[in-house]
Structure formats: structure tokens, C-alpha cells
Amino acid sequence: MKNPKPFGVVAGFVRLHKSSLGQARYYSIPNDVSIPASKRKFIPSSGTYPKGFLVACAHAGVKESNTQFPDVALICSETPCSAAAVFTTNKFQAAPVQVSKQVLEKRQGAGIRGVVINSGCANAVTGKGGLEHAKMMSAKVDECNGTPSTGPQDTSTLVMSTGVIGQRLPIKKILDAIPTAHSNLASTHSTWLATARAICTTDTFPKLLSRPFTLPSSPNRQYCLAGMTKGAGMIHPNMATLLGILCTDVPISPSALKALLTHAVSRSFNAISIDGDTSTNDTIALLANGAAGGEAITTTSSPDYAAMQTILTSFAQSLAQLVVRDGEGATKFIMVRVCNSPSHADAKVIASTIARSPLVKTALYGKDANWGRILCAIGYAQGIAEGTVVPERTSVSFRPVDGSAELKLLVNGERKAWNESRREDLADEDLEIVLIWCRQKGEKGLGGGGGVVLVCDFSHEYVTINGDYRT
């Protein structure tokens, strides 16, 4: 990429005014300030990236206020690859979601060349014109790859958009920017990082990870997995509210790739929540080009598949954690853990209900051990098996991550007295809420299920950010 700008100095669309509530937060990518000091530790200083994948970004000016910084991104494979994706469950699915689904269905997950993303406009609820714009973006990348499509239904590039809903894309600007980005395709760490930054909206830092690994069939062959994601608000499980692109140079068939992604997403991106809202655009895509060679993964019963499933799931969980750590206005990263539930499904529903409770989240922001709000959320959880929640067997505690003693709030349905000096434990950036159902002696019906959901707190600044989003 030619002279990429430092990612710490990036496009700013709106600046929040400073107030007595604390330091101003910059959203739609920070303006002329560096990434917040507390977030810099999450930005990798180097990376190992999969063979055969090239990335780049360019400025289009999707938002008129953005006069110079990248807002169009490309992730391209030098050869056709297998691809799979998981999409938003929102019924108002954005044009890029619909087009990407069509591309994958028509090609049956094979022969995909990459992904094009724009930030600044979601291209959602934009009618037939929005669909045409998404198809034009896909076709333009194919043209740049030297494999022009024969028609709008024959493209090989997935499309993603993020930003304000209900507005049309400035499509000419984007189509002009795509060749510029394509001419700068590269595989350097700085280019991957700049591309991860180009897809951001309210994020305060680019979310990028990479990981080398081996597989049982080729213990001496190095494979790589890289991924970038964006999201800081409108985040809730069920493939809700974020974009993510994962790439690997392992040879994997489309059917095996889909199974791998579905498993990984259910335990990562579908197990996080920031504000309980589900977006119109969210997509997680996984591309595998096989450029590193070796034995192809074609079935779900092979040792390589099992190893890849573990690696991919762990990797996706790490990416998902970055999204929660960058929650809009967040001051805390919270793990809600449910233990001894009759089933994993029930445990996940209960953990998710706690995670999306505004009262629980505001109490955590205020460093208030208000376990009554946690119990309230447990009590109204929907869709769980009868008898799952037994008040007199319910225990709730806070578990500091620094290894200090667990703060027990409720034990077998009885309030547990605790020292107010432990209140300082609630000021920690990381905290775990543990919910346990106690099994009676000799009983075999409980203890089989557990679930974890990641969430952040609600602060004054979340309201400020979203109240000012379009102003």
C-alpha cells in the first residue's frame, strides 16, 4: 500500500463535545487524536498472515465530512477460494446481505475471490436501488481482478456495508475508490491493520488478529488464520450487529467450511452483547484458499477437521472479545457464566438475558453489587425448560479476575452478607458474574449444562454517543 496513513490518525465524522461526564469519545473513527491509551494494548504490533490473501483500503468519502481517510476496504484471494458466511437474523436484511447470500448460493460456496466493504453507510432499507448498488460493488471488484462477471447474478465477490440505515450509497465515489484500493493490494501487517481500520464506524480501535498453526496431517506445515471485525454498538447474539472477515490458507471444502463457521460463531459472535439491538447488516464470512497446500479438509469426521474446529472457535472467541471490549462508552468487560443448568441451551438463554438487562449493566457501571437486578433478569428469561430456575437453589457471585476471593452475593436463595470494602473489586475493568444452581444430594437432573455470554456495562456516554449519532 502506498504511504498508508498511521492508523491512529483516522477519519472523523462527528466529534462529541466534552462534558462533565468524562473524556469526550470520538466515533465513526477518531478524528485527530490517537487511539485511547486503554485500548492500545489490543492492537497487534505484528502479524502472520495467510498465503495468497491481499488487502487494501482507499478513501471514497462515503460520508461527506470524511475528506481524506479510507472507508472502502478489499480482502482478495489470489486464487478462487471456498467461502461460508453467517448473516444477521434481522428481518430487514440490508442489500449487501442479500447480495452476498445470492453469491454464495449461486456458487455453492466455491470460486469466491474476496470481500468488498464500505463504512459510513449501511445501504439498508434502500429498495431495489440499494440492491443494484451492492451488485455494482461486487462486479467492480471482479472487473479489477480480471474476471469480469457475465451479469449481476454471476459475481464472485461478497459485499458488506456498515453505517447509518436508510441512506443510499454515494455509489460513484465507491466505484471510483475500488480500483484505487485494488492497485494497492498487499499482504504487509501495516496494510492489514489499515484495512481493519477502514471498516470501523463507532469503534475506537481496529480489531485485527492473526495466528499460525499446524494440523495433524501436516505437522511440519505452517498454516495461518487472520481476521478483522468491526462493532461497538448495536451488538446482540444471533448474528446480530457486526462485520467480520476471517481468512485461512488451509484447503477446506465449502461444506466443511460452513460447518466450521457455524460452530465457531455459535460460541463466539453469538455469545456477546453490548446493547441488545440486532442490526440489519451483520455478516461473518470465512474464506479458505488452500494456498498453503496439504491435505484438504472435506469431511467433519477427520482429525484435521476436529483440530481446525478448535483453532477456529478459539480464534473467533478472541475476535468477539475485542468487540465487547470496545463497546460504546463501556468501562467494563463482563463475563456472565451460568453453571449446572439442565442444558447448554437454557444456560445460554439465561446468561444472555442477564447480559442484555439495562438495569444490570448500569449497576455494574455504578460499581453496585445489586444482585436483585440479576435475579430479576433470571426470573423473566424466556424459552427455558420448566423447572430450570429454582430460587432456593440459586447462587450468584462476582468473581474478580485478579484471583482475589469470590464475592458471594446469594447462596442457595439466601442473601449473603458481604463487606462493603469489597466494593472496590467492582471497579476492575474485567469482572465475572457466576450463576450456579445447586444440586441436591443424590439428584441427577442438574449439572449438565453451562453457558457464557460476554457483555459490557452501560455508561452515560453510551446515551451521548447514540443520541448524537447522526448530528
UniProtKB/Swiss-Prot annotation:
Class of the enzyme per the UniProt entry, highest EC level: transferase
Keyword list, A-Z: Acyltransferase, Amino-acid biosynthesis, Arginine biosynthesis, Autocatalytic cleavage, Mitochondrion, Multifunctional enzyme, Transferase
Free-text description of this protein's post-translational modifications in UniProt: The alpha and beta chains are autoproteolytically processed from a single precursor protein within the mitochondrion.
Coiled-coil parts of chain: none
Active site: T241 (nucleophile)
Site (Involved in the stabilization of negative charge on the oxyanion by the formation of the oxyanion hole): T162, G163
Similarity comment: family membership: Belongs to the ArgJ family.
Full protein name: Arginine biosynthesis bifunctional protein ArgJ, mitochondrial
Naturally occurring in which organism (per UniProt): Ajellomyces capsulatus (strain NAm1 / WU24) (Darling's disease fungus)
